[in-house]
Amino acid sequence: MRKVTKAKPPELYPPEDGSYLRGNDYSPVAVVILLHTDYDKIPAFLKDLSKVAVEAGAALAGFLQTEKIGIEKIICDVVANPNIRYVILCGVESAGHHPGKTFEAFAANGVDDNRLIIGATSLTPYLHNISLEVIERFRKQTKLMNLLFEDDRKLRTDPETVKRVINACI
């Protein structure tokens, strides 16, 4: 059996500001919760979901509101922690930006030479602020655990479901 070693994240980890909680730096899991409201109006059930994720062992748990800068920040924060191998995507899709569908397309297809997310249908699915190397490293480093495929909206935001997926990844 191969020995798994854990790396200490850099001193300034996570490098990007954002609306997230930091948990166990040595965990292989980050949780991305889609946000369908403004940051100052985050519903209690979504705030609780991020707390549950960190308490269940996630390295990071936070919100994704936009398909461009939001995804770029997630990529930077995840790549900065080499221990993260799984990204759990959950929550409720935002009507305007479709960050969930865009994140799914990014995980599945990557970007073209102009950093356009292949297969994305959102308005601005470009990742201009990070290098192609960092983008590719994220895609090689992580596997998407997608809860958005569930038709049941409650299941996509169910704390027990998120805990079970985190435990399966750990």
Tell where the protein language model's regions lie, with residue ranges.
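N-terminal donor/sugar-recognition subdomains of glycan-related enzymes
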Residues: 1-27, 141-170
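Conserved mixed alpha/beta catalytic, RNA-binding, or beta-rich assembly cores of soluble enzyme
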Residues: 2-114
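Residue-identity detector for threonine
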Residues: 5, 37, 66, 102, ...
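Well-ordered, non-membrane alpha-helical segments in soluble/globular domains
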Residues: 45-47, 70-72, 125-127, 158-166
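Long, charge-dense
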Residues: 91-152
